[in-house]
Amino acid sequence: MKKIITLFSAAIVLLSATPSCEIREGGGDSPKNAVDLGLSVKWATCNLGASSPEQSGDFYAWGETTPKTKFTWENYKWTKEEKSSYGDVILLRSKYNSSSNQGTVDNKTKLDPEDDAARAKLGGKWRMPTRAEFQELIDKCTWTLTSQSGVDGFEVKSKVNENSIFLPLTGFYSQTDGYDGSTLHHKDQGNLWVSDMDNTYTVTCYFKKGKPGSWFGTSREYGMAIRPVSD
């Protein structure tokens, strides 16, 4: 009996040591799921919508707060349709735009809080990271290609205090390269949204084998994963 109890206790210890992502929607700040890497913000253990670090979580278009499984210009929240003088349908931008040729001009380059998926889903101090905060993660951490529970990704280990997070290779959704917007592709790489734009392009932190942490300018209607941060 003593041996059985010992084994059971060991199992409990093992399970409690396994990282989890129980950040509940609207649950506010959850310190046990915010990893202190000694940086300006704390990073979530998992992607938004994931229940373990190796899961991709949900996919979002930039500026949308509801996940989906098909990503096109036609179903993007901030697209508006107008007709040309020839009667053709033109897809224009209704928000986050600086070009009069592409729609309503507001010159916004950073997501409003109500358009931040992490803030909308989690509440509290959770939000999407800025490009500067991701750059800090790149500069002040060591990125090592590894696998966790059979999923490839990067261990991102702080040079400040040696704490770490795992970023899985997620792939993304788009209508490029012959895809229809509903097929997850480029699963050999990770792409995570940031909350601010680079001129007319939205930006993701991009990482794959041989490229541990760099930048990729992309189109806002693409479906990407999100790793929340907490102030």
Per-range role (PLM):
Residues 24-231:
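Conserved positions within compact, well-structured domain cores
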Residues 1-4:
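Positively charged n-region of N-terminal signal peptides that target proteins for export
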Residues 8-16:
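Bacterial N-terminal signal peptides
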